[in-house]
From Swiss-Prot:
This is Translation initiation factor IF-3. Residues 182-201 have a biased composition (Basic and acidic residues). The keyword Protein biosynthesis applies. It is found in: Cytoplasm. It comes from Solibacter usitatus (strain Ellin6076). Residues 178-213 are annotated as: Disordered. InterPro entries: T_IF-3_C_sf (IPR036788), T_IF-3_N_sf (IPR036787), Translation_initiation_fac_3 (IPR001288), Translation_initiation_fac_3_C (IPR019815), Translation_initiation_fac_3_N (IPR019814).
């Protein structure tokens, strides 16, 4: 090793925890029938192979380490699926900022309110900010009233984290989502109505022609 150079620790290969690559002498072996036994690794491997399975070290830091007799291919698939499902369930909460002016018109207000509703339904927090310029800071109460109105319009979707605060030339308020309203799945498509009678599809029948007298 060259002096002054730091090398990252060697990554453990998953294959090192399978069959003959297991380096510990003794394991707590778990078998498909639910039985567990502390035994030499060689004996556990032999028993797993008799069952047509692999011996996989699933808890290398336990005392003694735990090894399980499984199909390694299926084990890897199940492990990746569990990791994928766990990542899907995780939601990183973000703070979405919406900026207003003290004289924000109704159209801009409604536009930003719709965005805030969507952000809250997605599980994110919303930070509404009123920015003051020049002498507008003398009317900071107008900005606070706007924020209170905004928070009141979102009570069905979020809860306010305290009263509006003035910091420098900005007033802001934080709104957290209501957990029961967080969208986790796509809405179901409405079912198509079934036609009750065949005649509705074919249209009205033609009346019979009058018979010749």
């Amino acid at each position: 090793m060259y002096p002054g150079r730091n090398f990252p620790p060697r990554r453990q290969n998953r294959r090192e925890n399978v069959n003959e690559s297991i380096r510990v002498r003794e394991v707590r072996a778990v078998f498909p029938d639910g039985t567990t036994e502390v035994m030499p690794t060689a004996a556990a491997l032999r028993k797993a192979q008799e069952l047509g399975l692999d011996l996989v070290l699933i808890a290398p830091t336990a005392v003694p380490p735990v090894a399980k007799a499984v199909d390694f291919g299926h084990y890897q698939y199940d492990l990746k699926k569990k990791q994928h499902d766990a990542r899907k369930k995780q939601h990183v909460v973000q703070v979405k900022e919406l900026k207003f002016r003290p004289n924000t018109d109704d159209h801009d207000y409604d536009f930003k309110k719709k965005h805030a509703i969507r952000f809250l339904q997605e599980g994110n927090r919303v930070k509404a900010v009123v920015q003051f310029r020049g002498r507008e800071i003398a009317h900071a109460d107008l900005g606070k009233k706007l924020l209170m109105r905004f928070a009141a319009d979102l009570t069905a979707y979020g809860t306010v984290e305290g009263m509006p605060r003035l910091e420098g030339r900005n007033a802001h308020v934080l709104i957290s989502p209501v957990k029961t309203l967080i969208k986790s799945e796509k809405p179901e498509k409405p079912e198509k109505p079934e036609k009750s009678e065949k005649t509705e599809k074919q249209g009205p029948s033609t009346p019979p022609a009058p018979s010749a007298s």
